[in-house]
């Protein structure tokens, strides 16, 4: 039999797994709604228990009722903390992806479908965006804010790696088509599965974005 807080605990487990992933898994819409619905139901139960006392409730005289109220209150509080933790982890991941130069179209295009793609809170076939509408809006606005901040220092890449490259030139494999890019030594057409020996500074951003894989 499900207990209070079980759904919130599932959200925390999703958040914990998200911390160890390089991408953002699908937003658990139905699970979030279920936790919020449980909070509302508990709040209604609390109001119903207190209604007969008309503001004169004495916990010492009504210990059984006081115990029930305490359990309901702690359950609501825990559920709220689970919701906050889940959304905080996803927000941190979104901001990290913005700093790494991820594209909103790539994130929104991550889909789940079929038996292996079904996740709790997103049952059913078909395709589902990895981001909620609110997350897509936050991603865009944070990206705009970062672009405005970076615009003050046009000669410095504030999103670049803090570690200097060990090798000036590296071998890379193209993981997905990226089109033509201009480098210091000319244009390169990046087509899937092709390999190049290039200056690391020219392709570092594409490596971070997942278009290229560094070899060796």
Swiss-Prot record:
It is found in: Nucleus. GO terms for biological process: DNA strand elongation involved in mitotic DNA replication; double-strand break repair via break-induced replication; mitotic DNA replication initiation. Residues 110-133 are annotated as: Disordered. SUPFAM superfamilies: GINS helical bundle-like (SSF158573). The keyword DNA-binding does not apply. Residues 111-127 have a biased composition (Gly residues). Its main location: nucleus. Keywords: DNA replication, Nucleus. GO terms for cellular component: CMG complex; GINS complex; nuclear replication fork. The keyword Signal does not apply. It comes from the Eukaryota. Component of the GINS complex which is a heterotetramer of div-26/sld5, drc-1/psf1, drc-2/psf2 and drc-3/psf3. The GINS complex plays an essential role in the initiation of DNA replication. Belongs to the GINS1/PSF1 family. This is DNA replication complex GINS protein psf1. It comes from Neurospora crassa (strain ATCC 24698 / 74-OR23-1A / CBS 708.71 / DSM 1257 / FGSC 987).
């Amino acid at each position: 039999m499900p207990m209070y807080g079980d759904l919130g605990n599932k959200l925390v487990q999703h958040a914990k797994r998200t911390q160890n992933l390089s991408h953002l898994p699908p937003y658990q819409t139905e699970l979030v709604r279920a936790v919020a619905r449980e909070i509302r139901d508990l709040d209604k139960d609390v109001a119903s228990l207190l209604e007969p006392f008309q503001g004169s409730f004495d916990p010492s005289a009504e210990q059984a009722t006081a115990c029930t109220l305490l359990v309901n209150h702690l359950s609501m509080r825990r559920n709220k903390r689970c919701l906050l933790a889940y959304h905080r982890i996803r927000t941190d991941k979104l901001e990290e992806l913005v700093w790494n130069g991820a594209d909103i179209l790539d994130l929104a295009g991550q889909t789940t479908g079929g038996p292996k793609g079904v996740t709790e809170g997103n049952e059913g076939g078909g395709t589902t965006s990895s981001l909620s509408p609110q997350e897509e809006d936050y991603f865009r606005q944070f990206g705009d804010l970062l672009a405005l901040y970076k615009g003050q220092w046009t000669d410095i890449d504030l999103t670049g790696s803090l570690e200097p490259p060990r090798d000036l030139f590296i071998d890379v494999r193209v993981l997905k088509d990226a089109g033509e890019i201009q480098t210091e030594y000319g244009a390169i057409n990046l087509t899937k599965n092709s390999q190049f020996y290039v200056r690391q500074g020219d392709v570092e951003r594409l490596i971070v974005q997942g278009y290229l894989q560094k070899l060796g």
